[in-house]
Amino acid sequence: MTLYEELKARGLVAQITDDEIIDLINNGKATFYIGFDCTADSLTAGHFMALTLMKRLQMAGNKPIALIGGGTTMIGDPSGRTDMRKMLTKEDIAHNAACFKKQMEKFIDFSDGKALMLNNADWLLNLNYVELLRNVGACFSVNNMLRAKCYEQRMEKGLSFLEFNYMIMQSYDFYYMFQHYGCNMQFGGDDQWSNMLGGTELIRRKLGKDAYAMTITLLTDSQGKKMGKTAGNAVWLDPNKTSPFEFYQYWRNVGDSDVMKCIRMLTFLPLEQIDEMSTWKDQRLNEAKEILAFELTKMVHGEEEAAKAQNAARALFSGAAGDAEHMPNTQLTEADLTDGSIGILTLMVKAGLAASNGEARRLVVQGGVLVDGEKVAAPTVCFTAEQLSKGIVIKKGKKVYHKVSL
């Protein structure tokens, strides 16, 4: 199987500009870049797709360029946003870029020129505005730019001229690196398609040469929103922001319908193994979730931390690695049950996790209650004597755990 065939089989390919891309990446002849706007001091789960793609391509002999958007971050990418980003100082951007580099080195080999890390501030901040308008601005049609998908939402609430320049700046990045670093391809999220086409067209018009672009499928949460630092629900790669245990638990708790998609797209497990896992059902889906969580935690935090997180999670949720003896617990009696079962609301009140049924209901409806690692679907959920005899672990919010048994 070729590299491109594998990327397709993993569901990573969204759009490509030309079929020439296939031969380039399959034969290790691509020098490609992916851009990272450093709007926070840590990468997030939203960057996972880009990082693992860079690793896959580098393993096949292609050369990655990780472009830190020190210059474009000062403008802000309007793609998929309904408001304007907060402006960052040069000092903030420099600090964030340094943090990014440490995290990227876990995925990409920068030794001996096998990969490059560049900062577009090195060329964007020195541009002469009048020369940019004459030499670059003349290559862009305002009519076409206004039709670009990346501006749709912002047009409704007001698109600043600052943000309107983002496409030109990103296109100039590609143009500059094509000339100075032999960069002939750009990869990015599917929401970047318009910006990426701007770069290939600028190179064609200014240099008369071909450059290529491919978009990868976006990683979205259960509400269909893009995961990462701007769409909420951020899961950070920095252990000081999201601990290895919390990181593990995030992936351990993905929905049944999402687990195989995540394994296929994010891990490096062989496709043959993934195809076999795709037939798993019921309890074996929990095993698949453990595999997903372990593989991704190992990738970010190392095998030792991944093993610790897995053991701790098993102790909390399944008892497979211990009984979580230091966890607060409540012992029920048969008298606490009605017709052999007890509802989640009553259970939470008895365990001291809620002051009233009303508070318990609100927590459940908001999705803040898990039992044995699974989100409680409705306030009407009940637990039988048989379930309670084995002991269950209730999680309220992010940090409150409580064991209940009969």
Model features per residue range: what roles?
Residues 1-32:
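Positively charged, low-complexity intrinsically disordered leader regions
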Residues 7, 44, 117:
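Divalent metal-coordination and catalytic microenvironments
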Residues 10, 89-90, 96-217, 221:
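Divalent-metal (Mg2+/Mn2+/Ca2+)-assisted nucleotide/phosphate chemistry catalytic cores
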Residues 21-78, 186-193:
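N-terminal catalytic cores of NTP/NDP-binding nucleotidyl/phosphoryl-transfer enzymes
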